[in-house]
Amino acid sequence: MSGKGKVHGGKGKSSEAAKSSTSHSARAGLQFPVGRIKRYLKRTAQNKIRVGSKSAIYLTAVLEYLTAEVLELAGNAAKDLKVKRITPRHLQLAIRGDEELDNLIKATIAYGGVLPHINKALLLKVEKKKQK
């Protein structure tokens, strides 16, 4: 070796090609990983069916939108309670407070607590006693 610089061997990308490569997420303008979602789709697909790249992008966009929606509502719930950290309780309040998300997410959230609710029949009996 003459020592005039690095010798690149093999089939690796040159520095110019490495700079121009962009991820699927960056091309789609998403934050969530499109490549990982596509890999999960391929792994869970029945009978080795083909998975199109647009389907992975679409699913990633839907997941990102739903996550942003839940986090925005949970952040508002945390802000209303004057705390800076989102807890499972805030997630529970956000999801159960929105009718569409409540229908979509039927799961029980660990350490989420319950929504405060008093049956109207119980309130009427208390009010009648106060009036007498």
UniProtKB/Swiss-Prot annotation:
CDD domains: HFD_H2A. SMART domains: H2A. The keyword Transmembrane helix does not apply. The modification N-acetylserine is found at residue 2. Residues 1-11 have a biased composition (Basic residues). Pfam families: Histone, Histone_H2A_C. The lineage of its organism: Eukaryota, Fungi, Dikarya, Ascomycota, Saccharomycotina. The nucleosome is a histone octamer containing two molecules each of H2A, H2B, H3 and H4 assembled in one H3-H4 heterotetramer and two H2A-H2B heterodimers. The octamer wraps approximately 147 bp of DNA. H2A or its variant H2A.Z forms a heterodimer with H2B. H2A.Z associates with the VPS72/SWC2 subunit of the SWR1 chromatin remodeling complex. Also interacts with RBP1/DNA-directed RNA polymerase II largest subunit. PANTHER family: HISTONE H2A (PTHR23430). It comes from the Eukaryota. Residues 1-30 are annotated as: Disordered. Transmembrane segments: none annotated. InterPro entries: Histone-fold, Histone_H2A, Histone_H2A/H2B/H3, Histone_H2A_C, Histone_H2A_CS. Residues 15-26 have a biased composition (Low complexity). The keyword Lipid metabolism does not apply. The gene is HTZ1. This is Histone H2A.Z. Variant histone H2A which can replace H2A in some nucleosomes. Nucleosomes wrap and compact DNA into chromatin, limiting DNA accessibility to the cellular machineries which require DNA as a template. Histones thereby play a central role in transcription regulation, DNA repair, DNA replication and chromosomal stability. DNA accessibility is regulated via a complex set of post-translational modifications of histones, also called histone code, and nucleosome remodeling. Belongs to the histone H2A family. GO terms for cellular component: nucleosome; nucleus. One of its GO terms (molecular function) is protein heterodimerization activity. It is found in: Nucleus; Chromosome. PROSITE patterns: HISTONE_H2A. Acetylated once deposited into chromatin. Keywords: Acetylation, Chromosome, DNA-binding, Nucleosome core, Nucleus.
